[in-house]
């Protein structure tokens, strides 16, 4: 029986692996708690070190291996920390990706890139637009002014909670909190997620700042009990911020 993920989780495990086997193992753990996942794709050029599948083939992606690794019918989010996003996007959409993240500040001509993605997967193609959500990731040092030209083109934003992207287990950068608050006050309609440095200690403040999705890496994967830690994060969403009951 194939498991179908819902794209509505608040607590989202971030998967950053160097092998196909690791990816399959972490997807299985995430599936057991019924959650969405974010798969981090790092080409080793825009950001390093490289993640799978770039660790096996830096240039040519093996679509069949990607399809083998991801359960049929599963949908997920991809964080594209790569120099040439369009060259890898098709393979991962075939595998089930429905949310796509581009990194503002790391890519030149991001406006042209967004236009091309909309053209390829928009209303003029045999693809349902509502199934593909496009977001922009904002580094700690990136000015929010750089986001403004693309507000009408994106479905959500992701604030990076760490200073060095592409590596899990780094300390949370507290200076991101006022940036989140400022963006939330200016664009209350745009969902915000945070990736990097999300722990049981930093999560309450992020939720209270208006964050609607927490992308969590080492705090889940390096915990003694993945499922219990996931539940603890879930309980926090009911105690803090917009999800408090």
Segments (PLM) and residue ranges:
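Alpha-helix-loop-beta-strand connector modules within alpha/beta enzyme cores
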Residues: 53-78, 116-140, 175-193, 233-245
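Glycine-rich phosphate-binding active-site loops on the catalytic face of alpha/beta enzymes
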Residues: 100-109, 158-169, 209-230
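Glycine/small-residue-rich loop that forms an oxyanion/phosphate-binding "nest" at active or ligand-binding sites
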Residues: 50-113
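Hydrophobic, well-structured mid-protein blocks that either form specific transmembrane helices
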Residues: 87-145
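Conserved, mostly hydrophobic/aromatic
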Residues: 30, 39-40, 92, 157, ...
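Catalytic cores of alpha/beta
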Residues: 23-29, 84-94, 141-153, 198-214
């Amino acid at each position: 029986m194939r498991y179908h993920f819902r794209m509505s989780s608040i607590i989202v495990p971030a998967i950053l692996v160097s092998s196909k086997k690791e990816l399959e193992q972490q997807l299985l753990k995430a599936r057991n708690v019924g959650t969405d996942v974010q798969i981090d794709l790092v080409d080793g050029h825009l950001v390093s070190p490289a993640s799978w599948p770039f660790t096996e083939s830096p240039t040519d992606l093996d679509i069949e291996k990607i399809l083998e690794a991801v359960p049929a019918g599963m949908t997920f989010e991809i964080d594209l920390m790569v120099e040439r996003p369009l060259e890898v996007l098709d393979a991962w959409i075939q595998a089930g990706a429905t949310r796509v993240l581009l990194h503002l500040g790391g890519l030149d001509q991001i406006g042209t890139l967004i236009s091309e993605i909309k053209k390829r997967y928009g209303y003029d193609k045999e693809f349902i637009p509502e199934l593909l959500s496009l977001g922009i990731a904002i580094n700690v040092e990136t000015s929010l002014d750089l986001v403004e030209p693309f507000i009408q083109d994106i479905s959500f934003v992701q604030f990076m909670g760490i200073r060095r992207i592409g590596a899990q287990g780094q300390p949370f950068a507290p200076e991101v909190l006022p940036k989140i608050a400022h963006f939330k006050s200016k664009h209350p309609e745009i969902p915000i997620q945070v990736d990097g440095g999300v722990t049981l200690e930093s999560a309450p403040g992020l939720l209270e700042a208006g964050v609607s999705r927490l992308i969590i890496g080492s705090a889940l994967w390096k915990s003694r009990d993945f499922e219990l830690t996931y539940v603890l994060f879930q309980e926090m969403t009911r105690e803090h911020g917009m999800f408090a009951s």
